[in-house]
Regions:
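Bacterial N-terminal signal peptides that target proteins for export
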Residues: 1-8
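Bacterial N-terminal signal peptides
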Residues: 9-17
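Short, flexible loop/turn elements at secondary-structure junctions
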Residues: 2, 76-78, 126
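Short edge beta-strands and adjacent turn/loop segments
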Residues: 37, 45-79
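Short, non-transmembrane amphipathic alpha-helical segments
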Residues: 40-43, 82-111
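N-terminal presequence-like segments and adjacent domain-start helices
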Residues: 19-44
Length: 183
């Protein structure tokens, strides 16, 4: 490239980066984003304390300002049995659903009211006391996504891929937890 072409490329880069930055500056956060941030913060603090775990992620699905999904991810010391994991996941999902459905300010922005387990995602990433990953035969991740509870294993031979996933419907898991608490 000659000097003129290099100069033109540099000038174009500055012009284009200026356009992109001006677009970013024009973004206005929707009103409901503040409500959702408060909801996620309050729920996560409550669940952290109740289940002795640490929040490591949050998520909001809000295409065109319509709230379709709320997510929380936690790190917890394990291993956990399926029964223990199920009870925690069900408790987390129920807390999120109740908190969202009680909040009248957010209702007009919800895709559906009442909010259900299909609108909530909860993930528990399990670690040893030393902070290491947990491998099969114990669960490494327990999650609730789209109304299903998943129990995932990783093998130490292939730690980047889940070697086994067990699944149950959230409603079934909820009934099992409720029946267990009646005993």
């Amino acid at each position: 490239m000659n000097k003129i072409q290099v100069s033109i490329c540099i000038i174009l880069m500055f012009i284009l980066s200026g356009c992109v930055l001006s677009l970013l500056d024009s973004y206005e956060e929707p009103e409901q984003a503040k409500f959702l941030g408060d909801i996620l913060n309050n729920v996560s603090k409550k669940l952290q304390k109740k289940y002795t775990m640490r929040t490591i992620g949050t998520g909001i699905g809000m295409p065109d300002g319509v709230v379709t999904m709320l997510a929380l991810s936690f790190e917890k010391t394990g291993p956990l049995t399926q029964e223990e994991g199920r009870a925690i996941i069900v408790g987390c999902v129920e807390e999120m659903i109740q908190t969202v459905n009680k909040n009248e300010k957010i209702r007009p922005y919800l895709e559906n009211y009442p909010f259900t387990s299909n609108n909530v995602e909860i993930r528990l990433f399990l670690k040893t006391k030393e902070g290491n990953k947990i491998y099969e035969p114990d669960y490494g991740v327990i999650s609730e996504i789209d109304g299903s509870v998943n129990y995932k294993y990783k093998s130490s031979e292939n730690p980047k891929k889940y070697s086994k996933i067990e699944e149950e419907k959230f409603e079934e898991a909820l009934k099992m937890v409720q029946n267990k608490s009646k005993k």
